[in-house]
């Protein structure tokens, strides 16, 4: 008897999980006629065009020739990022964090 009741509960749970309430008005960002987000068909926003790469860029990457593909990039794209934070500011931030840690360890927690 107990297994029949458990089976019925399991069947009802399965039916609840598989039942769909009906079509939804909003679309998921990855589906539908308007890829890119939930928006109405008369939305004034046009999707941005994809960036254009120089001719032969992908061929250079596919052939394993990094020189050919890097020659078409601006020199600033290949340079390492500049560190704009001064050493003094880094030191001050480090001391501030150390002070906070010390206070947290010394003060009793409620």
Swiss-Prot record:
Location relative to the cell: Secreted
PROSITE patterns (alphabetical): GNRH (PS00473)
Renumbered residue ranges of the record's region Disordered: 25-85
Modification Glycine amide occurs at: 36
A Pfam family of this chain: GnRH
Keyword tags: Amidation, Cleavage on pair of basic residues, Hormone, Secreted, Signal
Leader sequence residues: 1-26
InterPro entries assigned: GnRH (IPR002012), Gonadoliberin (IPR019792)
Tissues expressing the protein: Midbrain.
Gene Ontology terms for molecular function: gonadotropin hormone-releasing hormone activity; gonadotropin-releasing hormone receptor binding
GO cellular component: extracellular space
UniProt xrefs under PANTHER family: GONADOLIBERIN, PROGONADOLIBERIN-2
Similarity section: Belongs to the GnRH family.
Function: Stimulates the secretion of gonadotropins; it stimulates the secretion of both luteinizing and follicle-stimulating hormones.
Protein name: Progonadoliberin-2
Species of provenance: Suncus murinus
Source lineage: Eukaryota, Metazoa, Chordata, Craniata, Vertebrata
């Amino acid at each position: 008897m107990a297994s029949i009741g458990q089976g019925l509960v399991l069947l009802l749970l399965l039916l609840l999980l598989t039942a769909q309430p009906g079509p939804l008005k909003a679309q998921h960002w990855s589906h539908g006629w308007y890829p890119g987000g939930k928006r109405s068909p008369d939305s004034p926003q046009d999707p941005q065009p994809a960036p254009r790469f120089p001719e032969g860029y992908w061929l250079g990457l596919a052939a394993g020739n990094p020189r050919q593909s890097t020659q078409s990039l601006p020199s600033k794209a290949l340079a390492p990022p500049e560190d704009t934070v001064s050493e003094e500011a880094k030191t001050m931030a480090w001391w501030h964090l150390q002070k906070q840690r010390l206070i947290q360890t010394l003060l009793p927690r409620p």
